């Protein structure tokens, strides 16, 4: 096995020497786009942090939202390193730091965020299907334990990617795969497949949860009022969460398997490898925009959050109207808040 790993590692290194990467787009366009996302993400998540500091963690829902916020903030803080590295505005040593540490932390927190969104969907599912049944999964102690487990899992599977690396040189930092030891390349493949499994498992479960939630809400509205604009808006809210999750994360996971394969074998031609690299960078940027989308989810789903944000609270107060609207608004809070 060690012989196979060593051969794979040498292939990855030799390939980086004979297959130079086309970085014109990643050096010019993506750093600008990432800068916009970084500034917007820091602003939105700083406001969200201020709000959540004033909200006690007295429900599983709030616990999951707070963990999502922490993951998003850490992701955002990793972006300046990528921006400086990709734009070649920093010394080559920073590129080595990005490959061995900051990008690893970035991916780690991305998958923490993915699992937290899955737990949020599960929490909504339980509150809609079993609103009055008391069970241990509805206790904050359970939510905190699961959250710690998620962070611990991602930390321990990410740690070898920070350790199993060779000494950085000006030539080896051009491709992160060239920095990895033979065992590090093998572990990178293991982690990549593990993360693929995490994403698709969460996505399928979210799809099932929200399908059941939508059916439950639809049947409830049919029973009491057959045609209601509030009902349609509520359906849109439910599917917006699924849409954001799919649009942000699915493209990256379609691309990541062939990209990782191209990085760890010697069977991909240079043109295809460069195309996969651009596709990976484009879909990674799309996934990064999730740090700006999650604060919108807080506003849509969390009543306590909107009560703490003055501009949102003022806007809702202006739109508050008849008693029928008030009743519908409360129904929305029961189903989504």
Curated annotation (Swiss-Prot):
Xref: Pfam families: 7tm_1
Coiled-coil regions, chain positions: none
Keyword Transmembrane helix attached: yes
InterPro entries xrefs: GPCR_Rhodpsn, GPCR_Rhodpsn_7TM, P2Y13_rcpt
Topological domain spans for side Extracellular: 1-31, 82-101, 166-193, 259-281
Family annotation (Gene3D superfamilies): Rhodopsin 7-helix transmembrane proteins
Task performed by this protein: Receptor for ADP. Coupled to G(i)-proteins. May play a role in hematopoiesis and the immune system.
Protein name, as recorded: P2Y purinoceptor 13
Naturally occurring in which organism (per UniProt): Mus musculus (Mouse)
Gene (name only): P2ry13
